[in-house]
Amino acid sequence: MTNPPGQSVSANTVAESHEGEFGCTLMDLRKLMELRGADAVAQISAHYGGVQEICTRLKTSPIEGLSGNPADLEKRRLVFGKNVIPPKRPKTFLELVWEALQDVTLIILEIAAIISLVLSFYRPPGGDNEICGHIASSPEEEEEGETGWIEGAAILASVIIVVLVTAFNDWSKEKQFRGLQSRIELEQKFSIIRNGQLIQLPVAEIVVGDIAQIKYGDLLPADGILIQGNDLKIDESSLTGESDHVKKTLDKDPMLLSGTHVMEGSGRMVVTAVGVNSQTGIIFTLLGASEEEDDDDKKKKGKKQGAPENRNKAKTQDGVALEIQPLNSQEGLDSEDKEKKIARIPKKEKSVLQGKLTRLAVQIGKAGLIMSVLTVVILILYFVVDNFVIQRREWLPECTPVYIQYFVKFFIIGVTVLVVAVPEGLPLAVTISLAYSVKKMMKDNNLVRHLDACETMGNATAICSDKTGTLTMNRMTVVQAYIGGTHYRQIPQPDVFPPKVLELIVNGISINCAYTSKIQPPEKEGGLPRQVGNKTECGLLGFVTDLKQDYQAVRNEVPEEKLFKVYTFNSVRKSMSTVIRKPEGGFRMFSKGASEIMLRRCDRILNKEGEIKSFRSKDRDNMVRNVIEPMASEGLRTICLAYRDFDGTEPSWDIEGEILTSLICIAVVGIEDPVRPEVPDAIAKCKRAGITVRMVTGDNVNTARAIATKCGILTPKDDFLCLEGKEFNSLIRNEKGEVEQEKLDKIWPKLRVLARSSPTDKHTLVKGIIDSTAGEQRQVVAVTGDGTNDGPALKKADVGFAMGIAGTDVAKEASDIILTDDNFTSIVKAVMWGRNVYDSISKFLQFQLTVNVVAVIVAFTGACITQDSPLKAVQMLWVNLIMDTFASLALATEPPTESLLRRRPYGRNKPLISRTMMKNILGHAVYQLLIVFLLVFAGDTLFDIDSGRKAPLNSPPSQHYTIVFNTFVLMQLFNEINARKIHGEKNVFAGVYRNIIFCTVVLGTFFCQIMIVELGGKPFSCTSLTMEQWMWCLFIGIGELLWGQVISAIPTKSLKFLKEAGHGSDKEDISRDTEGMDEIDLAEMELRRGQILWVRGLNRIQTQIRVVKLFHNNHEVAHKPKNRSSIHTFMTQPEYPADDELSQSFLDIQEGNPELVSKAGTSVLLLDGEAASHDNINNNAVDCHQVQIVASHSDSPLPSLETPV
């Protein structure tokens, strides 16, 4: 095998010198981790003498872990590698400049400017210009004619400025995102035992020899071998394609692989491979190989150029891909086949906003193209007819360059019309707004994984929220108990219980709770004890402490490795059971779980003397009516504690139906989880904002109803539904058990609480609401989740929220936004930010479209009437710069206000440009056009100055057209203030001082305009103005604000003839409309540059594993993600990268051509993104009690920065 990537020869030499200090080498461990099942067990036993011996060779203790000695840790990193994957260097500023130069419109402008520059030096022979139609009326103008090169040079200079600004934007965004990425990396931690202490360690610091504590929901950050496990089941579909969960035991299959998910149970493992030496790291190695091959091919063939998509491809090739040395491999397919395969890959589903922006941008671009072509054609026809028909001139050979110069000038005017018309600033505004919002949302405890989720939340019409930890504080406390036939409203003293009962309570809780759940001293004196681990279990452990007992002493007597069998909690069992050996022989099993479910498994109960008596169905009904329901009505979660002894013959532990029955009830406890004090107000805000909040919980229906009432989801006078999962299913399914949308449509509008629900129920509800067409508009649904089984619902939702504190890695990977404080109020803030993004885009659109309409009409009309554009090419480029970069920066960074929550959601189909906005756009366009045309055709008379109309080629700048240009720009500047309000508000200055960026941009633009007019001279076709002329320009500009008040006073309802624009379409239409997908998606293309995105999911993991198995010719095949991140962080942490599409082609071919892998003699199970996108993909998996976490729709297959594995 080749050396691991990222290590130089000298580094390898040093590493080899230290390898002798350990009992096994890096290559030994890599080979060992490639084995599975019985082969691995045999190799561990024969070659190493067991797992304990491997620990000894790695100089680690399976109980105490590593000592944490810095020198020892550094030595391990040197010998076995670090738990990171090295990134490729970032692109330099010059590379970004070169990529910005690939813009097709800029290229056309550059060519035209160069031609103009060259021809400007040409003079007809003999100096007689009159014969060519160019009359030099004075020596002064002849001198000016000699400086005709300035306009061409100025256009080139303007292009350079535009390119530099674009490159700087890309560079600064990438730098910002990289900084943000490195900050978040530090938050990703894993449970590691060092010096006998369980600590949370950043995954990048994990080394070979570490002892890792693994539990339900974890995403494994490294390869390892199981030391001790409790009912451990792993989802290895990301590596093998096998959807069944793999049971891990010491004697059958102890191999644990990075990138796989813990679906059930817990355990400990010794880390044997990290970083690029882990099984997943080896895949990254091959990925690096294919990337280098692609790069070589690209260099040989040269770049195809011209198309905008190529320009964006170049832009997205950011230097954040892996820099990994390839293993020996062969080329899979030739380039032509690659391109065909890539072309067939279905395009991703767009977000609501992206779909609307794409359509609008294409429509505006087409209109601009038509206007620019018309402008050029009319100018050329006007010139030809005037010179060769009306004036009857002949086409003389010596005049050809002069005529060409005129034609080039006309062409430049046409191109500048196109530059102004095409909404290049629109995608930039989206990117700036989203990036700004994402950064600010982090302060509001929203960690955005997928950029489009930010704006989608602004459209949310429904929120399906968990109860525990989201609406409640997730601080569990036992406040009531039913023990020995007595209902204690307060926790009694321990001496009221018989010693046997007290011992069973203490042992049952201490042993039958995960050993990772603990009660620790408060951080501050006088504070509450800290609850670490599962909060329900912490509540029970707190109950033991309240009884003045020590749970840790019991755990010390029965350490985790002595537990005989553990049935871990899952959504099917709704309970947890632990079996231990009794000292006198036989076994004892402790169980705990939901009271209604556990009581059905009990046939005996302890009385107050601690004696066992029978427990009949009548007794059960009495307990439910007199104990459980009163507790639940107070909002308490009821947990039943039970046990069972097994004497005599050892039972078959795998037959759960026989084991988890005939239990003896010890106690029922009522656990309080108080509602967060800020939640009722947050839910009231949601109601005002037109958002329906539904609670989906696994708790008892009475508990759920009580909490929902406290939160404000339900009020006493409401007639809303509060259903249990079983009843919900009976109402929505037919005789065959299939969900009927029509039945579901009758239920969900009134449903507010779904209790005792399974993950399947949650997914069914979310899917049903999203697919429903019963209402006036389609619903946009947000969902919260924290468990591994919440994955399908989180993926199906328009926006999935995972819990940052209580959430599992699987839930986080499936989500779009992570709530770092697990608080419902943070969701409301996300709604506010989402609506603010939508408004920011609308503000920019209102401003930009006004400029578009006016600039294009002025250039077109001026060209038709005066054979010249009143706004020169360089001036138009300056206007374009104001309009695109500066305005997007100013309008896209407005902070949100509470007023955003006082209106109803926009929904999927509401247009981007409302009738009010259309009124503002056209109203201001009318004002500006009247002023500009007045100044163009009467300005010379009004100001008593020389006319600038029909000026000869290369004539000097005139005050007349300078006033036109200056007034035009000042009107845009003041209209930018008007554009801050899009809903007809009167006060356009409200909150303006809170937005420092806006004030800076407006003042900065005004200062630049003064410099351009006064000092710009010939390059900008300007000449200095008098103070009086400046005052008039300023007065007309301020008139925009006054005119804005007039427009806002006109009732929009009375302007029914106005049309809305920027309509969206349903999500299905967007994703299935292949013709629309082939159009240039400007919004998407810009968003894919330097944006924040997290790489998602498992579908690409499977692809890359196929590549590995193809090259190694092994027997297992599947998919793997395209990202170049580490295994742990690509699931649980955001990315701030830019795409490299060409380097992905190799993997895309594998994905698009499973037959290729099949030919290698392997069997393929497809679990890819295409299959995952179907609506009902998860149902069967969940119903079979096996949840396949389906890969999310990839917004962009982006590579990552350096992130830990």
Curated annotation (Swiss-Prot):
Topology relative to the membrane: Multi-pass membrane protein
Reactions catalysed, as given in the entry: Ca(2+)(in) + ATP + H2O = Ca(2+)(out) + ADP + phosphate + H(+)
Consequence of gene disruption: Male mice lacking Atp2b4 are infertile with severe reduction of sperm motility.
Stretches of the chain found on the membrane's Extracellular side: 122-147, 391-409, 866-872, 943-956, 1017-1029
Tissue specificity comment: Specifically expressed by sperm in testis (at protein level).
Alphabetical list of PANTHER family matching this protein: CATION TRANSPORTING ATPASE (PTHR24093), PLASMA MEMBRANE CALCIUM-TRANSPORTING ATPASE 4 (PTHR24093:SF435)
Record protein name field: Plasma membrane calcium-transporting ATPase 4
Source species of the chain: Mus musculus
Gene name, Swiss-Prot/TrEMBL: Atp2b4
